[in-house]
Amino acid sequence: MSYNFIKSNKENDFYPVNQSEIEEVEKNLNLKLPSELVNFYLEVGYGFIKGSEFNTNRILDPYSVRDFRLRINDFEFYPDIEIYDEFENDKLIFFEGSESALMSIELNDNNKNPIYYYDIQIATSLTEFLRKIEENDQYYLDLLDDE
């Protein structure tokens, strides 16, 4: 999978991730990270997608994904973190749209991993999600209105 559409935007800001970091986090969590997320980490890394003024649009690094899941370090006292308890059973928080908008990626063995905002599917794959975020980094809010 090529993420050139993300890499080619010079306003995006990414940092490399190596295989050993991914393996360490998988061991710490006792689970396999979704294949699309692993591929993205290895091809692009983690970091920020340029968007609107008030959104962070941060793809969490593997250690932050782990820390959120375990509620440790920076996430130990994260505001209202307990809200996500019920939405994480088969998903993993990986993206921070804003402080109050966190997205999760489905844990499955498929080549495509659906993306969720709370329990609402907002994209069928990581690639679709990233393309939509680049176009409109608040598109998922409109989907909430439809529910």
From Swiss-Prot:
Supply the source organism's classification: Bacteria, Bacillati, Bacillota, Bacilli, Bacillales
Where does this protein reside within or beyond the cell?
A: Cytoplasm
* Function statement: Immunity component of one of 6 LXG toxin-immunity modules in this strain. They promote kin selection, mediate competition in biofilms, and drive spatial segregation of different strains, indicating that LXG toxins may help avoid warfare between strains in biofilms. Mediates intercellular competition during biofilm formation; disruption of the operon disadvantages the bacteria, but overexpression of the cognate immunity protein restores growth in competition with wild-type. In situ neutralizes the toxic effect of cognate toxin YxiD.
Q: What is this protein called?
A: Immunity protein YxxD
Pfam families recorded: SUKH_6 (PF14568)
Subunit relationships: Probably interacts with cognate toxin YxiD but not with other non-cognate toxins. The interaction inhibits the toxic activity of YxiD.
Q: What happens when the gene is disrupted?
A: Deletion of the yxiB-yxiC-yxiD-yxxD-yxxE operon has no visible growth phenotype, however it is out-competed by wild-type cells.
**GO cellular component assignments:** cytoplasm
Q: Point out the gene that encodes the protein.
A: yxxD
- Which keywords does UniProt give here? Cytoplasm
Organism encoding this protein: Bacillus subtilis (strain 168)
Q: What induces it?
A: Expressed on rich and minimal solid media likely in early stationary phase; dependent on DegSU. Not expressed in liquid LB, but only under conditions that promote biofilm formation.
